[in-house]
A protein has these predicted regions:
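C-terminal catalytic histidine-bearing segment of alpha/beta-hydrolase fold enzymes
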Residues: 48-50, 230-278
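Mobile cap/lid helix-loop segments that gate and shape the active-site cleft of serine hydrolases
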Residues: 32, 170-205
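Short beta-strand/loop motif that positions the catalytic acidic residue
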Residues: 209, 214-217, 221
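Catalytic nucleophile-loop/oxyanion-hole region of alpha/beta-hydrolase
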Residues: 74-76, 80-83, 94-130, 258-266
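Primarily recognizes the serine-hydrolase "nucleophile elbow" in alpha/beta-hydrolase
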Residues: 114-179, 197
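N-terminal cap/lid segment of alpha/beta-hydrolase-fold proteins
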Residues: 22-56
Length: 278
């Protein structure tokens, strides 16, 4: 009976029918021009806002950074498809179409920070509590999310973080090489590259003010070594930052919201429990 209740709850949580899906509101992230210009003039930063019913709103919001190795974005299963789940919990979801770095990390970083600031600027209208704005990221988007969580301050700093199979380090021994090269570029001196690798190895940037974290990954991930997530969790633990890590025995990389992931419902249930824990 208990198992049946759990299964029923999970099905209700993850139902994403067109009837209940909230229509997103697309916004230009930089209507007055971006702080950092991209070499790709066609690459425009945008965000899509999915708001829960006002009667259901908890005041929470999650700013979502899809993955794609800093070359493209998996906007659906690592972005828009999460809207119904979060809205059903009374949480706003903001999916960010951030620009690619082409060797300049501040391009995606500034886009993600701008998204968080925009959410806080619209907090009253959108029924959001400015102190309950989190960031979520997948793969390279997990690197971007953890960069914001460990580097950003003031109105750009998130209150919690959710990371799926994240790239965390830029250490060549266990980073994701594509993300490393696309983010940092490849034409630096050895000394400058070492500095950049250290600055953007987010496990090295954790301190006691880093926001609480939920981390989920598969043990058999061949694209981004699971050691990335382990290393980040270890540093959060050492600095007394509340964190929850969930390691699934299989699934590889890039499952996002796909129900074909064998542990999809378990992952959803565990994340819901974590969100309810604070």
């Amino acid at each position: 009976m208990k198992a049946l209740k759990v299964i029923t709850t999970l099905l209700l949580l993850t139902s994403a029918t067109a009837t209940h899906a909230q229509k997103g509101m697309k916004m230009d992230l930089w209507p007055n021009g971006a702080t950092y210009n991209s070499t790709d003039k066609e690459d425009k930063a945008e965000m899509t806002v999915y708001l829960p019913d006002a009667k259901k709103a908890t005041g929470r919001a999650v700013v979502c950074c899809p993955g794609g190795g800093y070359t493209h974005l998996a906007m659906d299963h690592e972005g828009h498809q999460w809207a119904t789940f979060f809205n059903n919990q009374g949480i706003a979801l903001i999916v960010v179409k951030y620009r690619m770095p082409h060797g300049n990390p501040m391009i995606p970083v500034s886009d993600a920070e701008q998204a968080i600031k925009t959410v806080r600027r619209n907090a009253v209208e959108w029924h959001i509590d400015r102190t309950k704005v989190g960031i979520m990221g997948f793969s390279a988007g997990g690197h971007l999310a953890s960069t914001i969580a460990t580097h950003s301050t003031g109105d750009a700093a998130p209150n919690f973080q959710i990371l799926f199979y994240p790239v965390i380090t830029m250490d060549p021994s266990f980073t994701h090489k594509g993300s490393h090269d696309n983010l940092l570029g490849t034409d630096h001196s050895k000394k400058e590259m070492k500095r950049l690798e250290s600055d953007y190895s987010n496990d090295l940037q954790v301190n006691r003010t880093t926001p609480r974290a939920f981390i989920a990954l598969s043990d058999d991930d061949k694209a981004v070594p699971a050691a990335n997530g382990f290393s980040y969790y270890e540093q959060l633990y050492k600095h007394d930052v509340p964190a929850s890590i969930h390691i699934y025995p299989s699934g590889g990389h890039g499952w996002g919201y796909r129900e074909s992931f064998a542990y999809h419902y378990q992952m959803i249930f565990e994340m819901k429990g974590w969100l309810e824990s604070f």
